[in-house]
């Protein structure tokens, strides 16, 4: 038979043949189904079909072909075939209640970790099949060899060993699957030691053995407020997913009782904290009774993180803070959702193609959201208040009184007038047609205001109607109703006090001082221009940008100088050109001080600077045009200085334009406003007044002053 075997099975070499025969011979006469895939894994280079074919040959022959080759081993008292038969019967067959007895020596070997690892590697697939055939019920026979876990409780100075079937340990505690894998290369000795509380690990062992026969009559271990945190942390480390979910659900339902126990909540990692926080609504977190603040602030911090998560669908907040930024013009905190609803300064009001007013905000790139949150925490002193303030910053509602969209933090900022507007008749004043006045504060208003911005001298709470488009008839369930309830419940933290916004009011209020200055500077001499206190709001909006440009030109002409106008080398050239002009101007401007012609050179320089600044205020554009040309009548030094000033002006304009593109209009305006007139604001006002008064009026006033002085001089005693 062995000769026929060698002829008919040329695909086997001698070593594989002997190993396969040793494995298959003990299976002869056993009626159970054999898992040929598991047997094929034991012998490299063989397929399940080849193993089955060889098994049929051995059954037909009826004797083992390797008995003669292993007589020496059998004579020594140890039969490898019998030893292997015990292993095969316990792990390679689909057994239904038979062969339940294991050798006594097997337990001793398994406790030391020997041979049990080999069994662990090879019986996993068969145990999976057993689970399938038995309808998912884990039996002791299909759970593989027992593994011993050494538990060390360093806090209590205790050590205890626990025994658990290998397959059950892997299926319940997936942490050990990596170390008890089926790779034949890892069939080394494994010693499992766990540093954990003995009572907690005992609870975990009872939990994973809850469906076994030996614990069928035992009570199911239960979660308690005192042990759920420790079990949660241990089960998460051991990758017991089902138990982790049970612990998280238990924490959600019994958090008040848990925080009252002396448990350490700092051991909960960020992943578990996020999963627990997602089960809580912000109202439930706020209602927690956590006197020592062991867990409440952590939940609110996670809620703040969720507000900034763009992919998270937050049931507590309709808006998201992922796009939060601050406008550098109106200083409001906005998101992509609120930037077109919340008004900015009048200069940034636009009209879309459908005729609706839209607002364009400019992002302040110097603002940082982390610094903002830290400053909020320093101000409010708790993460709970920080969350509610941030929630009110990103969520918005619409007022049914003023028909304006408002942020929840501005709930008490609905502006109104206590008295109705009064419009004068056409016969009373021709200059105020279409302009009314509020008697309560004397604020002027247009009859038809295109800006549609609500302004008032008093504030009150906004009024919100609970009608959501597309919502059902259940108002308490709609987002607007829930948001309004939260706003009323926590308004002491959410709502910020009202403060008059001077930046956003420019050009809107007709009695506003900045708006008056704007239009007076633009067109001071036009007969149809607005008078003091009678500004047109729409024109002030229209000319906002022009006024900023003209102010920047004024300040630039005052600043761009290298001192060439007052150098000693240039005095002669300037005297030749401007002698006649000064002779004509001196009787008009300096009749009060006739002795200035013999003053010091420093006084002459100051006088020239004042004259030049006054002439710049009168005609700034003409001065800039003259400096752009090379003057052949002047010296080389003068032209070089003028060219240098022109280059400096160009570079400053380029720099200012780049700053404007990067930081916005407001920083540009502030930088220009910081550069005052060379002689101060009063000298600028004086120059503007002198430029606006006709020459004849100035001449007559100067003559009157001269006559009065002469009369006083004659009346004095010698």
UniProtKB/Swiss-Prot annotation:
Pfam families: BTB_SANBR. Residues 118-142, 555-622, 692-718 are annotated as: Disordered. Disulfide bonds: none annotated. Coiled coil: none annotated. Residues 555-576 have a biased composition (Acidic residues). Residues 604-615 have a biased composition (Basic and acidic residues). Transmembrane segments: none annotated. Belongs to the KIAA1841 family. Negatively regulates class switch recombination or isotype switching in splenic B-cells. The BTB domain is important for homodimerization and for its function in negative regulation of class switch recombination. Homodimer. Interacts (via the BTB domain) with HDAC1 and NCOR2. This is SANT and BTB domain regulator of class switch recombination. It comes from Homo sapiens (Human).
């Amino acid at each position: 038979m062995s000769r026929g075997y060698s002829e008919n099975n040329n695909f086997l070499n001698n070593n594989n043949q002997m190993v396969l025969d040793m494995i298959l011979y003990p299976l002869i006469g056993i009626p159970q189904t054999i898992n040929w895939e598991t047997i094929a894994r034991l012998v490299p280079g063989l397929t399940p079909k080849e193993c089955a074919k060889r098994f049929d040959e051995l059954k037909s022959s009826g004797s083992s072909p390797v008995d003669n080759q292993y007589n020496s081993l059998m004579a020594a008292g140890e039969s490898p075939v019998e030893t292997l038969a015990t292993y095969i019967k316990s792990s390679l067959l689909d057994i239904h209640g038979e062969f339940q007895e294991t050798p006594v020596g097997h337990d001793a070997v398994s406790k030391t970790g020997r041979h049990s690892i080999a069994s662990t590697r090879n019986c996993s697939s068969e145990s999976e099949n057993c689970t399938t055939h038995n309808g998912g019920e884990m039996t002791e026979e299909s759970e593989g060899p027992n593994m011993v876990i050494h538990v060390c409780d360093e806090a209590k100075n205790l050590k205890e060993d626990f025994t658990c079937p290998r397959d059950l340990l892997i299926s319940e505690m997936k942490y050990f699957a990596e170390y008890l894998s089926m790779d034949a290369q890892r069939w080394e000795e494994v010693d499992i030691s766990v540093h954990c509380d003995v009572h907690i690990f005992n609870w975990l062992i009872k939990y994973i053995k809850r469906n076994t026969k030996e614990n069928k009559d035992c009570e199911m271990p239960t979660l308690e407020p005192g042990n759920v945190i420790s079990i949660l942390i241990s089960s998460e480390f051991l990758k017991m997913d089902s138990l982790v979910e049970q612990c998280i659900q238990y924490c959600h339902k019994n958090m008040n009782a848990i925080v009252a126990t002396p448990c350490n909540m700092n051991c909960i990692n960020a992943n578990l904290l996020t999963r627990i926080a997602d089960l809580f609504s912000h109202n439930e977190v706020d209602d927690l009774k956590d006197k020592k603040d062991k867990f409440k602030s952590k939940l609110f911090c996670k809620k703040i993180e969720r507000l900034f998560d763009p992919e998270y669908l937050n049931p507590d907040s309709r808006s998201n803070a992922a796009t939060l930024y601050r406008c550098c013009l109106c200083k409001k905190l906005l998101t992509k959702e609120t930037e077109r609803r919340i008004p900015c300064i009048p200069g940034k009001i636009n009209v879309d193609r459908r005729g609706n007013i839209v607002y364009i905000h400019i992002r302040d790139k110097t603002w940082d959201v982390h610094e903002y949150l830290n400053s909020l925490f320093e101000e409010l002193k708790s993460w709970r208040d920080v969350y509610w303030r941030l929630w009110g910053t990103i969520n918005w509602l619409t007022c049914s009184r003023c028909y304006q969209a408002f942020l929840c933090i501005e709930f008490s900022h609905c502006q109104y007038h206590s008295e109705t507007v009064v419009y004068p008749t056409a016969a009373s004043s021709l200059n105020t047609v279409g302009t009314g006045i509020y008697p309560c504060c004397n604020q002027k208003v247009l009859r038809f205001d295109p800006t549609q911005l609500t302004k008032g001298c008093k504030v009150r709470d906004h009024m919100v109607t609970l009608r959501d488009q597309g919502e059902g008839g259940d108002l308490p369930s709609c987002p607007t109703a829930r948001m309004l309830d939260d706003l009323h419940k926590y308004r002491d933290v959410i709502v910020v006090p009202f403060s008059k916004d001077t930046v956003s009011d420019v050009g809107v209020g007709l009695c506003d001082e900045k708006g008056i200055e704007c239009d007076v500077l633009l067109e001071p001499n036009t007969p149809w221009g607005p008078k003091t206190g009678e500004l047109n709001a729409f024109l002030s909006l229209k000319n906002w940008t022009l006024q900023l440009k003209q102010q920047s030109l004024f300040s630039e002409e005052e600043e761009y100088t290298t001192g060439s106008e007052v150098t000693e080398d240039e005095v002669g050239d300037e005297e030749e050109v401007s002698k006649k002009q000064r002779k004509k101007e001196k009787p008009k401007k300096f009749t009060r001080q006739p002795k200035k012609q013999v003053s010091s050179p420093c006084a002459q320089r100051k006088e020239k600077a004042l004259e030049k600044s006054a002439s710049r205020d009168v005609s700034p554009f003409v001065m800039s045009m003259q400096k752009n040309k090379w003057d052949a009548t002047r010296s080389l030094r003068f032209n070089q200085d003028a060219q240098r000033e022109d280059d400096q002006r160009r570079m400053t304009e380029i720099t200012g334009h780049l700053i404007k593109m990067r930081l916005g209009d407001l920083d540009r305006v502030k930088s220009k406003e910081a550069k005052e007139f060379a002689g101060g604001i009063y000298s600028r006002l004086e120059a503007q007044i002198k430029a606006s008064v006709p020459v004849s009026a100035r001449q007559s006033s100067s003559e009157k002053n001269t006559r009065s002085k002469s009369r006083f001089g004659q009346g004095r005693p010698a």
